[in-house]
Amino acid sequence: MTSLFNLKDKNAIITGSSRGIGKAIAYRMAEHGAKVIITSRKIDACENVAEEINSTFGKDTATAISCNISDKEQLKNLYVKSKEFCGSITTLVCNA
């Protein structure tokens, strides 16, 4: 059966994706072919989710970047590191 949702060549930043709904969104987007940036304030939690996604869907499907979205400098860093990881951002999920 062909997937109804082809996210190949899509790159998503998902805020608050180290647990709960954000983690589920990241997992499903990766399942359908997207590269995902896992972000929250807690880098250890982000890294765990990214490792889980990468082990399930392949190396370099996910990366972890710590970010407090209320801090402008951290947001700039999130953008720069995300572009380094995947080249462009096609999707932003504001879950935090």
Where are these regions (language model features)?
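Flexible N-terminal pre-Rossmann segment of NAD(P)-dependent oxidoreductases
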Residues: 1-13
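Conserved glycine-rich cofactor-binding loop
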Residues: 11, 18-20
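Rossmann-fold scaffold of SDR-type NAD(P)-dependent oxidoreductases
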Residues: 15, 89-96
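Aromatic pocket-lining residues of Rossmann-like dinucleotide-binding sites
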Residues: 29
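Conserved glycine-rich Rossmann-like NAD(P)H-binding loop of the short-chain dehydrogenase/reductase
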Residues: 32-49
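The beta1-alpha1 cofactor-binding region of Rossmann-like NAD(H)/NADP(H)-dependent oxidoreductases
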Residues: 43, 66-78
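Hydrophobic/aromatic anchor residues within beta-strands of the central parallel beta-sheet
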Residues: 62-64
